[in-house]
């Protein structure tokens, strides 16, 4: 059944406090307020579902005399990567908008991600996107992309080449602009790939075999 790391059972600790605060944090040495844990340094980050539900906590604990200074950054990045992979897996049949912090930093753990239906309904997203667009967990399923940006999804599709490879500048109703990359569902990509191939196949001439003289073959 595991061990309880509530404050009542273990004193102040990173796991229990991260669950309550819903944010990454570190607790070191005497901050645990429990003599038995006074030698520890703990860094923890909560993990949320694409719908904003708290799923658990990722924690790194060790002897504070040997703990590297970047532990909190490491556990925070790892939690973000888990959340992002969860979105990619759960919403592979939906459209996704990825928001890199810079145009050349596509696919980093820090980028925001929103999952959408083809009609523009926002189905879920990661914490970065929720904070960037001021989205609450209660908004999922009722929020539309048109509530966030005046630029239609169809216009994002029409610009540039392959949608999943094209980073575009997108305006927001707030007056800001963001970098965005539209990724279609696996099914939609297959359909569009087939449509793109049909004109090419239709225009490709089929080589004609030279006529064969049947009588000449009897000689």
Regions found by a protein language model. Name each.
Residues 8-12, 16, 20, 24, ...:
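Juxtadomain coupling helices with adjacent low-complexity linkers
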Residues 202-219:
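AAA+ ATPase active-site-proximal loops
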Residues 31-64:
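Extended hydrophobic
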Residues 30-31, 39-44, 148-205:
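PAS-family sensory/regulatory modules and their coupling/dimerization elements
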Residues 1-16, 74-76, 102, 108-173:
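PAS-family sensory domains
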Residues 1-22, 28-41:
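Intrinsically disordered, low-complexity polar/acidic regions
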